Amino acid sequence: MSWQNYLDKRLNERRNTPLWRKRQVIQHSNGRYLTTLSGDKYVNFSGNDYLGISQHPDVIQAWQRGANEYGVGSGGSGHITGFTQAHQQLEQQLADWLGYDHALLFSSGYSANQGVIATLLEKEDAIIADKLCHASLMEAAILSPASLWRFLHNSAPSLSQRLHKTSANKSLVVTEGVFSMDGDKAPLAAMAEISQQHQAWLMVDDAHGIGVLGKEGKGSCHEAGIKPELLIATFGKAFGISGAAVLCNKATAEFFEQYSRHLIYSTSMPPAQAVALHAALKVIKQDDEGREYLQQLISFFRQGVSSLPVTLLPSQTAIQPLIIGDELRCQQLSDYLQREGFWVKAIFPPTVPPHSARLRITLTTRHQISDIAMLIELLHGFFNQNR
């Protein structure tokens, strides 16, 4: 089979189905609203900017100051010319904030997850991962020479059984703090205890917990009262920017600096971005009011949709999935909301398990109660018309 025939075959399998992915050009977004290239304006219920920090004037001004001081790029890997005082200060601030020896900056959460697993695991080792872990974690685990075992979602007993069965040299337990498609929290305290009993390390990707959960927004692990050996803090959600950091002890940080290809051979984030992240961290630490308001929005939304004829997952976070199941019906609902001025994107397999197509509704502090009330009214209207 030629390359062209292969590509055509695979594309035709998906074309004209709800599974066909297409990027849409956004002309402007301020968190609450987004405007497409055609000029249409929508209330945005699909973004991850949970605290609205991407629009915060202090953060915007910090990026501008950083660009004026350092330029718009780092110019190289952190091991060559790309590690500036701005990077160093941000790493130290993150480590102090979260109670670790070190923080290492990566260009994205995907890169951080891939880098940790690719660097640490060898053939005699085992990765014990939650079945619903993010694609970045699962891809890294599959590509790793280590054995991969998956435990039932958020099941501490299933994790314990897997660890009992493994005879690996070293074991790494992998989970998310808040799961990106379900919005539920991992039982981190139980998982940490089980991991310690088996001398396994625990790795927590807290992309959707950092900034919005725990004291000062310190995240899922702080809220659960644990300190995993490896904590991934990403900056594309509550921080409102992009990039990530791996929090760990001194020896582990030195190991990554020596052996992590994702760290060594990647151009580091722009120094101006590090300056902006420092400003975002200051906002996050002080924004208890924003976190409290977000919880109020979550409660209001859940109460309003509780009687809908769909499955509302038991999430108490900003991620509120409505499980529709049927892919065509899910797309019809998303299209209906878009016609009414609401941007709520449908999520399909393989991003989520089979037969669990859903609307992944995300709430942010940029929303008003009136926005959510109208969304609730539209959802009820759709199901009343399409019983």
Curated annotation (Swiss-Prot):
InterPro entries: Aminotrans_II_pyridoxalP_BS, Aminotransferase_I/II_large, AON_synthase_class-II, AONS_Archaea/Proteobacteria, AONS_Proteobacteria, Profilin_CS, PyrdxlP-dep_Trfase, PyrdxlP-dep_Trfase_major. It catalyses: 6-carboxyhexanoyl-[ACP] + L-alanine + H(+) = (8S)-8-amino-7-oxononanoate + holo-[ACP] + CO2. The modification N6-(pyridoxal phosphate)lysine is found at residue 237. Its cofactor is pyridoxal 5'-phosphate. Pyridoxal 5'-phosphate binds at residues 109-110, 180, 208, 234. Substrate binds at residues 21, 134, 351. GO terms for molecular function: 8-amino-7-oxononanoate synthase activity; actin binding; pyridoxal phosphate binding. Its EC number is 2.3.1.47. GO terms for biological process: biotin biosynthetic process. Keywords: Biotin biosynthesis, Pyridoxal phosphate, Transferase. The keyword Hydrolase does not apply. Homodimer. Belongs to the class-II pyridoxal-phosphate-dependent aminotransferase family. BioF subfamily. This is 8-amino-7-oxononanoate synthase. It comes from Proteus mirabilis (strain HI4320). The lineage of its organism: Bacteria, Pseudomonadati, Pseudomonadota, Gammaproteobacteria, Enterobacterales.
